[in-house]
From Swiss-Prot:
Lineage, uppermost ranks: Bacteria, Pseudomonadati, Pseudomonadota, Alphaproteobacteria, Hyphomicrobiales
InterPro entries for the chain: Transposase_8, Trp_repressor/repl_initiator, WH-like_DNA-bd_sf
Pfam families: HTH_Tnp_1
Signal peptide stretch: none
A GO BP entry: DNA transposition
Keywords: Plasmid
Superkingdom of source: Bacteria
GO function terms (MF aspect): sequence-specific DNA binding; transposase activity
Protein name: Uncharacterized protein y4rG
Keyword field contains Lipid biosynthesis: no
């Protein structure tokens, strides 16, 4: 029998004690319950994220939100056609709101430096919520 195959005896164990300490770990930050964001809160954050020069990640983190979530909300808003980003060359915010028909099936509403585009068949209550947030 080689040394590795020899059965361990009390005399061998007596000279080679090993001590193991079991550590338990807890997360540094406990997981919070997911927050429910209202449509108005989402619209406000998306509007801020669409501002020229906006730092989307910083905006998200300032609200305790994962940046990927705000990017997803922004992407959804843009793909829906309900909002559009303004470019850096956009004029300074104006003090009035403009409402225009863009063809027969689309309306465009400008509130300050935010442009809201919606289909003519948009739910008025949903549009009102969006407009309250971007005012």
């Amino acid at each position: 029998m080689s040394h590795a195959e020899k059965p361990m005896s009390d005399s061998v164990n007596h000279h080679h004690h090993r001590t193991f300490e079991v550590l338990t770990a807890e997360p540094v930050r406990s997981r919070r319950k997911p927050r429910h964001w209202s449509d108005e809160e989402k619209a406000q954050l998306v509007a801020e994220a669409l501002s020229p020069g906006a730092n989307v990640s910083a905006i998200a983190r300032s609200q305790g939100l994962d940046p990927s979530q705000l990017y997803a909300w922004r992407r959804k808003a843009l793909s829906s056609g309900m909002v559009a980003p303004l470019t850096e060359g956009a004029p300074a915010p104006v003090k009035f709101t403009r409402f225009e028909a863009v063809g027969s099936s689309m309306v465009e509403i400008v509130v300050g430096d935010i442009v809201v585009r919606a289909g003519a068949d948009v739910d008025p209550d949903h549009l009102a919520k969006i407009l309250r947030v971007v005012r």
